[in-house]
Amino acid sequence: MRNDADTASMPRVDGDRLWASLERMAQIGATPKGGVCRLALTDLDRESRDLFVQWARDAGCTVRVDRMGNVFARRAGRNPDAAPVMTGSHADSQPTGGRYDGIYGVLGGLEVVRALNDAGIETERPVDVVIWTNEEGSRFAPAMVSAGVFSGVYTLEYGLSRSDGAGRTIGEELERIGYAGAEPVGGYPVHAAYELHIEQGAILERAGKTIGVVTAGQGQRWYEVTLTGVDAHAGTTPMAFRRDALVGAARMISFIEVLGRRYAPDARATVGMIEARPNSRNTVPGGCFFTVEFRHPDDAVLDELDAALRAELARLADETGLGARIEQIFTYAPVPFAPRCIDTVRDAARSLGLSHMDIVSGAGHDACYVARVAPTGMIFVPCVDGLSHNEAEAITPEWATAGADVLLRAVLQSAQEA
């Protein structure tokens, strides 16, 4: 086998083979509207895992499964003791999910292995292609739990004890489908990790770029806000006498929208839930509950958004007489990816002549947890109209091939490093 990574002789993926693999996998859990439903640790998830394992073994990989059910297909390197280069994503989906979310990164990683085999290239380091268990969180909360156990964010006991709506735990379902592995979860060095994924947004498509060089994952802060006024008769209470909690919420929602735009383009400010009380058509609402979510790749900006929200809420209470309570219920720190992995992805896109741009991941991904224990990078390709978590989710064969070619070059470069 060759062991050089000379740019002129770099291998390319077989785009037709990759697309055929994606189409075949999409038959598992296919929905009438063209999407997929493969909830984590269902029989359909098992079927998708079984197919991946078969393909990986056909490509000469050895397969191991850890105690969280994460599946690792290893292509051997010249030095079996060297820390591996890791790539992959997830195979589970939303209930009405798309055909490419997650699985594109898994099968893109498998195509890297196949392309290296086709070219007869022996890498210095092993290459691992991984399926992470329960990335979506649609059946078992929280999302990305198995990558979280791998990176030490959660304990193994916590991960295995997560339950679905019927009370079935991850541990029980892993046993049921035959993917309760014996391998320890994590605890070993990884030289570099790359995750290939659809963007799940419209930035790349609107910018006319084929590749997104992901520089970071956004931090998140979630809040619950309760405003308290006075229930009152809608017909007998003059406007000047009202303490309307819903009107106060409307003012806050408008402020939050303006606040998010003030910190554009990277900020996201969302009110996703609202509940007026008593929720009667002829009663002035005396109570209102709503949620706020902020996202940004810089913790300092998240602090500013937090301070602005609290200040405006205090101002509202002072001016209207409404009671106001705010509770921060979740925080997730921004995740900067490794500069050397970012540079490797960018250089790969440039060497292939592909249009590209730096981008921040608006969604959470397994790579955001892996980045805590290994140098990590991500590669995005566009998706049509930015749709994801939707049965209409779509990418083109050309985008799929381009992203996998970038992944191939990034993995090969890292796998040849001493």
Residue ranges of predicted features:
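Active-site-adjacent substrate-binding region
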Residues: R12, W19, Q27-T31, G167-T215, ...
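Acidic/His- and Gly-rich active-site-bordering loop/insert found
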Residues: R12-G98
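Zn-dependent metallopeptidase/amidohydrolase metal-coordination segment
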Residues: L18, R24-T31, G88-S89, G286, ...
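Alpha-helical metal-binding/catalytic segments enriched in His/Glu/Asp
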Residues: M25, T87-H90, T96-E136, R221-L227, ...
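A short beta-alpha structural unit
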Residues: A40, T270-N279, T291-P297, G323-I342, ...
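Flexible, glycine/charged-enriched surface loops at secondary-structure junctions
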Residues: R64-D66, E122-P126, G181-V185, T236, ...
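Midchain, well-structured core segments that form catalytic/ion-binding scaffolds
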Residues: D92, N134-E135, R139-A300
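Short beta-alpha connecting loops at secondary-structure transitions
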Residues: L156-Y158, R295-D299, I329-T331, G386-P397
